[in-house]
Amino acid sequence: MHVRAPWSLPEPTLAYFPNARFVPSDRDLGAGALRLVGEDCPAPTRGGVAVADGPTEPGFNDFHHVPVLAQRCVELLRPALTRHHADGSEAVLVDATIGAGGHAERFLTELPGLRLIGLDRDPSALEIVRTRLARFTDRVTLVHTRYDGLASALTELGYGAAQSIDGALFDLGVSSMQLDQAERGFAYSKDAPLDMRMNPQSALSGADIINTYDEAALADILHRYGEERFARRIAARIIRRRADRPFTTTAELVALLYEAIPAAARRTGGHPAKRTFQALRIAVNDELGSLRSAVPAAMDALAVGGRIVVMAYQSLEDRIVKRVFADAVASRTPVDLPVELPGHGPRFRSLTHGAERADAAEVEHNPRSAPVRLRALQRLELEALPRQGTGKGES
């Protein structure tokens, strides 16, 4: 297993379970040992997922990462990964958000010939996953990069950025192991430095934004990325407070948010800090910009017959995925023509009817799956399908 870190890295949200406390569950696992080439990754820490209630917190090795909708991901991607051989030989899967490696482990176990490339911007995640996937070392390559570095990673690994892989998987959900590392500043339930960087090597932190951006820019971030209806009110309070002293900790920001949001609003809609923390984290890590580049790059990298699955956990991400997918399945032929013009047919076909959701059994087994929206596409040969409308307006 290999890893590289060719560039510094400037991902989404704590707000999925706004009233929750954190209990160990489904994002981490310790296993054997692997060597990561070219990256000094910190040791793994305990993990957890936000749920409404749960058992007393055990140690890091006492629980198992439960990947969201793992069986459905396998069902959707297996046909593309077994086109050459039933065991996945000669197929390449890119796990663009490998995290603790739950999905990767499932695919590598079920398809003993599959090669997997795992991407993550967080060196802590790579340390955990390299340990978890130790027994698959000859079939796994880990790359320290944001997921919008996918094309560059494939090129540097010798695959090429176009039509070179058979499957791509994006699990955009928040990593509980990052939330559980209090010093990272992601969790509003814990006092910590106001950091929020997915990659500790990145330059911009949450404190930088809070302490240096002007009132209009702060309000725009809170409204655009947090969909916070009190964005202007909060921004004004931040400006007044930092004139006295700069913000340095999450607790200071949480206290201000509690005061800034009206009491009536605090009684509904979850924790008063959830939207602001989401917005700051998205801005610090350029999550949405990265996603807008990453999904099209993954689609371009798919060979004909290849498939992509994307799981989003909040509406801002899902809207981006929905728009990109809708464009990919749309015909470019004018709607008033009865036949498809050469080269104007859809490039992909949808494998899901809109966004799929986790069923009750999945949510009970894995609470983190409650907000998930899964979408999937398959790459087509040009002119592979007869004209059946434009494909626009899919829900």
UniProtKB/Swiss-Prot annotation:
It is found in: Cytoplasm. Signal peptide: none annotated. InterPro entries: RsmH, SAM-dep_MeTrfase_MraW_recog, SAM-dependent_MTases_sf. GO terms for biological process: rRNA base methylation. It catalyses: cytidine(1402) in 16S rRNA + S-adenosyl-L-methionine = N(4)-methylcytidine(1402) in 16S rRNA + S-adenosyl-L-homocysteine + H(+). Transmembrane segments: none annotated. The keyword Cytoplasm applies. Its EC number is 2.1.1.199. One of its GO terms (molecular function) is rRNA (cytosine-N4-)-methyltransferase activity. The keyword S-adenosyl-L-methionine applies. S-adenosyl-L-methionine binds at residues 101-103, 120, 147, 171, 178. One of its GO terms (cellular component) is cytoplasm. Keywords: Cytoplasm, Methyltransferase, rRNA processing, S-adenosyl-L-methionine, Transferase. Belongs to the methyltransferase superfamily. RsmH family. Specifically methylates the N4 position of cytidine in position 1402 (C1402) of 16S rRNA. PANTHER family: 12S RRNA N4-METHYLCYTIDINE METHYLTRANSFERASE, S-ADENOSYL-METHYLTRANSFERASE MRAW. This is Ribosomal RNA small subunit methyltransferase H. It comes from Mycobacterium ulcerans (strain Agy99). The lineage of its organism: Bacteria, Bacillati, Actinomycetota, Actinomycetes, Mycobacteriales.
